[in-house]
């Protein structure tokens, strides 16, 4: 068996090791020539994983039986493109785009009433001088709210906002006052924070069937952008926990079907 690993950072080492223990020949790709996974794999290729064509060209003749990925964030779309082109099981490019584009994800779920908080797009092309105007445009927004990059993971660049004043301050960080003509290098989204307790979900797609593995409660520390993960707690086996599990599983089953996810593992926070 042959596998291609897209994204070969340090976090991929365990995956490579386990694949090799099963007798799988691993070809790893990463744009960083010093990536740890390139050295650990049976074959390492220095290729920018954001370049779908270059990745496809490299794998076309190698004909991997399946893909394995590290935490590659936005460029999960490259894995989807490879799966589509080579007819491999796993996430499609369209499904990967839904999962990595936070604004598109919101719009897609909103179509089926699976998400009811307001979510607004702040494009990178917006002029810095508009920061104050943008804050006024969002005057009907309900707080708390979250401002975050349209793409990315790991709580990167997140602002947790409790009032309009904090929103204006956050927009000033995105639009530096001393750069009259500069614009943010990326789009942002501003959305109303869902009330209640935050939960993390670990799950996988068994073909087109959603299977939940772990449901864990999460707490937000201050400040939010420094991270908010805490050690997992073993859930109590009582009626409340059982009903919560069933409700989360039912919602995510509908969500994954809408996004077209098949044969994949995922972690989703709600």
Residue ranges: model-predicted function:
Residues 1-95, 128:
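ATP-binding N-terminal substructure of ATP-dependent carboxylate-amine bond-forming enzymes
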Residues 28, 90-92, 118, 147, ...:
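Hydrophobic residues in well-ordered beta-strands that form the structural core
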Residues 37-40, 55-57, 98-104, 157, ...:
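Short, charged, surface-exposed secondary-structure boundary motifs
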Residues 43-48, 85-87, 108-110, 164, ...:
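Short, hinge-like loop/turn segments at secondary-structure boundaries
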Residues 101-188, 194-195, 234-250:
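Active-site nucleotide/adenylate-binding loops and adjacent lid/helix of ATP-dependent enzymes
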Residues 174-178, 184, 192-237, 245-270:
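Phosphate-binding core of ATP-grasp and ATP-grasp-like enzymes
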């Amino acid at each position: 068996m042959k596998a291609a690993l897209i994204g070969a950072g340090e976090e991929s080492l365990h995956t490579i090791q386990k694949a090799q223990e099963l007798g799988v020949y691993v070809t790893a790709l990463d744009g960083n020539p010093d990536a740890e996974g390139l050295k650990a794999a049976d074959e390492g290729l220095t290729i920018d994983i954001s370049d779908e064509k270059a990745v496809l060209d490299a794998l076309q003749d190698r004909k991997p039986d399946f893909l394995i990925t590290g935490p590659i964030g936005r460029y999960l779309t490259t894995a989807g493109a490879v799966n589509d082109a080579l007819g491999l099981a796993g996430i499609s490019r369209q499904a990967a785009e839904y999962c990595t584009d936070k604004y598109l994800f919101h719009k897609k779920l909103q179509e089926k009433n699976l998400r009811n908080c307001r979510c607004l797009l702040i494009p990178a092309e917006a002029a810095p001088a508009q920061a104050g105007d943008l804050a006024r445009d969002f005057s009907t927004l309900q707080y708390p709210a979250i401002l975050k990059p349209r793409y990315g993971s790991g709580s990167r660049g997140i602002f947790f906002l409790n009032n309009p004043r904090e929103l204006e301050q956050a927009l000033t960080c995105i639009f530096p006052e001393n750069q009259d003509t500069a614009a943010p290098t990326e789009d942002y989204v501003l959305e109303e924070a869902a009330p209640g307790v935050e939960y993390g979900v670990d799950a996988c797609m068994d073909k087109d069937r959603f299977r939940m593995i772990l449901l864990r409660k999460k707490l937000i520390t201050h400040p939010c952008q420094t991270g908010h993960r805490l050690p997992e707690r073993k859930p109590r086996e009582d009626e409340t926990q059982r009903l919560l599990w069933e409700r989360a599983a039912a919602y995510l089953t509908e969500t994954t079907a809408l996004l077209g996810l098949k044969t994949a593992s995922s972690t989703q926070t709600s």
